[in-house]
Each structure stands twice: as C-alpha cells, then as structure tokens.
Amino acid sequence: MDYEFTEDWFSENNPEKVVRQFDEFLSEFKDKPCMFLEIGSFEGMSTIWMLENILTEESSQIFCIDVWAEWTGDAFVRFVSNINKTGLKDKVHIVKGDSSEELRIFPKEYFDFIYVDGNHDEKAVIKDAIGSFRILKKGGIIAFDDYLLGISYPNSPGSKAMNGSTKKAIDYFLDVFQDELEIIHKDYQVWIRKK
C-alpha cells in the first residue's frame, strides 16, 4: 500500500526495532475480538501495523487519541488518509484531544492492549500510565514507548529537553503499581501485563 509517512519511529528501519516487540507480545491477540487503544498516533504507522497484523478479527477495534498539534503540520491529514487507504477505517475510532482528559470517557477494564506514546512530559506520562491502567482489562498489556528517550540517544532531536522524563514517570508508575502488574519487557520500550 502507498502510505505517506514523514517519520519512521516504528518499522524495522527504526534503530530500536520496536515492531519486533509488537509482533512478539501482541501475537496472542491475533484473529481474536480485541479492543486496542493508542495514545499518540501521529501519522498512523503503528496503527496500520496493528490493523493489518493483529486486529484481523472482524469485530476488533482501535481507538486513537492524539491532539495532532499544530507543530505536527499535516500529520492529522496524513493519518486520516493513511487509515482510509487500509480499507479498515470502520475499525478505527479517532479521538482528537488531550489523553489525560479523553481517557476518562472509557469504562474500567475496557481495553486488551494500550500503546502509550503521547506527550513525553513527565507529568503527562504519569497521567497516561495511571489512566490507562484503570481502563486496561486484567491480563491486558500496556506498552510504553520512549522509556530511554534522552538517555540512550542523547543527541537525537528533542531528547535533551526530555532529560529522561519518560523513564522517571514510568519508573514511578511501575513502583506504585508493582503488586498489580508484571513487567514482560524493559528496554527502550516497557511492556507490562495487568495481574
């Protein structure tokens, strides 16, 4: 398919090979009715991968929350265009807004999987983590992206401003909820399962 992306933070071309974790840890959901949530969808690269590779059962759906801020340029237009090209747009629910507010609309234990890759500010990450955990089903999985942002690639654009803020926030969340979760992967991304 001829999708349009200006950045590649997800595919095999990405130095962290994050798509490999998605393939490994989400395979249990393939061909099953699932509800997924993505916080921070940008142009839809990870959304499309999940639609085409995991959310293959007819009733599976994904909710995509993003502010699509002005600094992202035409990212929202590209997101909608890319999703339309999949032929699976009926499975995608677009929620344009701040995740800390939008997470409140979902009932407890609603999602099987939640991908957190939104605002990387420490306070925002903590809000996303706690809000996501509330709406995650028991046995469900959360993946936090950019855990080592500003640490493993200190010279990459924007990472100095982050100064490890995502790591601090995720570590705080993991400590507070340690009895209610299992860490299944911890590297550039952190993957947890709710007990």
What residue ranges belong to the model's regions?
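A short alpha-helical cap/connector motif
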Residues: 1-195
